[in-house]
Amino acid sequence: LAKINLGLDVLGRRENGYHDVRMVMQTIYLYDEVKLTKKKEPGIELTTNLGFLPTGDTNIAYKAAKLLIEEFGISEGVKIVLNKHIPVAAGLAGGSSDAAAVLFGMNRMFGLHLQQKDLMERGVKLGADVPYCIMRGTVLAEGIGEELSVLPAMPKCTVLIAKPPVSVSTKVVYEALDSEEIIEHPDIDALIEGLRQKDLHRISENMGNVLEDVTIPMHPVIEELKQVMRENGAIGAMMSGSGPTVFGLFENRAAAREAQRKIRESGLTKQVYVTNVHN
């Protein structure tokens, strides 16, 4: 399952280059399909429906399988069939959710009896978003993104996702961000209070992402997508993660469908999806 960031604040940069963050993350019902099958012969075989994706040990789903095979001395091999629906390199944690699915599936398939916290401890070795993709739901992430706390569940609403045809490097965006020059930090506490009150309007008013100040000047189409969503009934619209994906929150599914149609007609992007929050 994909994730969006309802709030993303950067508090500072550590000496090792990692950034201290405070983020509110939410799972949405947009998913990849991951099928695992045991093989008698050892080794990992990964296939995917997208020809440009790596299928070897640079693929995070492959790395997840390799991690468990090596740690537990699994003699059999595994075949992974990855059917991608979540846009790639979009700020939606698609790769991280695939890795989480492989950890879940292999835990069950090989009877490893790992609990959720055990899977999360292994997930963080693969990527900062993997533990969250194991946990799912409405979650506060702190530290470098590895300290997770469950929040009151996001109220039901329709989510419109639009991925423009541009690529964004998370590394480049964070490197360009000088935390001392962040003029306005999002009010994460007010956002959390909106979640407690199950008030979609208060949540939307307090959404914020400091990385927009870096990514939008690189790709103005992000601001254009936000504008189209707001003009067509979105209560709030924001870039997710380091971008370039934009999401809008709607109370009315019909309005979200109309905004989807307008975005496609505008030529801004063809990758537009109507979905829901998933708790």
Predicted regions and their residues:
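Residues embedded in well-ordered beta-strands within globular domains across many folds
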Residues: 35, 79-81, 238, 273-276
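Glycine/serine-rich anion-binding loops at beta->alpha junctions
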Residues: 81-110, 128, 235-250
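ATP-dependent small-molecule kinase catalytic core of the GHMP/sugar-kinase superfamily
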Residues: 7-23, 109-236, 249-279
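Short, basic/glycine-rich phosphate-binding loops at helix/coil junctions
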Residues: 40-54, 102, 197-207
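A generic structural signal for well-ordered coil/turn residues at beta-strand boundaries
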Residues: 2, 30, 134-135, 155-158, ...
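Hydrophobic packing within well-folded, soluble alpha/beta domains
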Residues: 34, 61, 80, 102, ...
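ATP-binding N-lobe of GHMP and related small-molecule kinases
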Residues: 1-90, 108, 112-120, 154, ...
